[in-house]
Amino acid sequence: MTTEELYDKLKLIQKMKCETQNLELKSAEQGYPKRLYDSLSSFSNQDDGGIIVFGIDEKQDYKEVGVYDAQDIQKKINEQCLQMNPVVRPLITVVEKENKKFVSAEIPGIDLADRPCYYQGRGRLKGSYTRIGDSDEPMTEYEIYSYEAYRRKYQDDIREVPRVTLMSLDQEELNRYVELLKRGKRRLATLDNESIYELMSIKRGEKVTLSATLLFSPYPQAYFPQLCITAIVIPGRTIGSLGDMGERFSDNQRIEGTIPEMLDEALLFVKRNMRTKTIISPTTGRRTDRTDYPITAVREAIINALVHRDYSIHTEGMPIQLIMFEDRIEIHNPGGLYGRITIDQLGKIQPDTRNPVLASALETLGITENRYSGIPTIRMEMEKYNLRQPEFLDERGSFIVKLYKESKNDYEDMSNDEETNNLIVFCKTPRTRKEICDYLGLNS
């Protein structure tokens, strides 16, 4: 940044009096900070990078104390950056204000294929960090694996399942799938079934793949008990709410079977637990039945979870969660977003596919289109129902879809309240409790 930009940043810090997702503050009045590699790592591992400002003391109400030696700090910043893998290349700026010197180090986000950036002195597993609000948190083993899986193009949907044999699969369903594969594919139609099994990743060598197990096994959960859907209905708006009889769940079901079977059962669960209104048109007198949520949107959200969840060994113990609250439906999908796509880009660009073989097989079976139309369809269906637009959240190791029962007009009326709207914008960046309390002028 330029010196003018750093002066502006110092003014903003005095106004906000907090660190943020992209800002770390260090005093450095009495000497160089004991550790910096956690911030170097976490900023490098996010798209927008981050800025470290030296000369601000949080413990003295963000007082501008200045640094002990601007020249030495620059040298030590560079030394620590060289100890990172990949090496971090900071952009350093120095300014003087009221006879005190302040130093900033801009840390650029590195390419997704090069992540995680970690401190070599602690190794990849212990030296990799991610930024959560104003905190640098150690990456989980799964978060580190997810970067490696993308970089090396792991295909967990076709990993081998040792206990499953070809003959243990549902032969009728398997044969139907092979016949569907052959339609319109002249060259494929000339091959024998054994060749097709290998070519289309139904098996690898003598081992059946995970995709084939999830699609054609009579009972996939015999091998992977948690590759299922846990569906619950909460009698309130938060988990922990109790019903009139003290019940925690109004309905509770473990949904198992093949992927097509789980999709059908999940839809039945949702239909069973939402209201259907009967509307009589005042002009035509015709009757129309209207459910709380558009079924097409619910179906797309569930099939997206089943197709795009992470199927690696790190998440095979985590089921998809389908939670129906009083005011919304939430679908929690193990794995988070895959590849380079961000939340803001969902439905606008073609994403990387985490499970390409599984997605292609479900397209052949007529379960999904595999044309990246799921998110736009969900949004369009909610719009048709005049409901609030869905929310998509990418949290640590989890992707969440929220479908709201609230009408679009009611939500927009609330959103037009300037104070509420400003708070929503402020919280789009992950914030700590202290940041939110400071913003609202409350005691933490």
List where the protein language model places each region:
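Conserved N-terminal catalytic/coupling substructures associated with nucleotide/phosphate chemistry
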Residues: 1-297, 302-408, 431-437, 442
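Short alpha-helical segments that sit at the start of domains
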Residues: 405-430
